[in-house]
Amino acid sequence: MAAKAFVLVETAVGKNKEVVSTLHKIKGVKSVDTVTGPYDIIAVVEADTLNEIGDIITSKIHAVDGISRTVTCLAV
């Protein structure tokens, strides 16, 4: 069974559309939704292992210009 995580993303002012577009292009990101509340975006990430999820988040998602903070919730 694949590992799955929900990544709650806070973006810099005015960067939401750009961040959504970039996240859609990252391999392993299965869905990206703009939401209301304390976070601006929720992305669903899936990979074969938790280590791969960690790599996607730290090397790909955190590198996206316009992301100011993330919180990752692993599905159990």
PLM segments and residue spans:
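A compositional/biophysical signature of low hydrophobicity enriched in polar/charged and small residues
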Residues: M1-V76
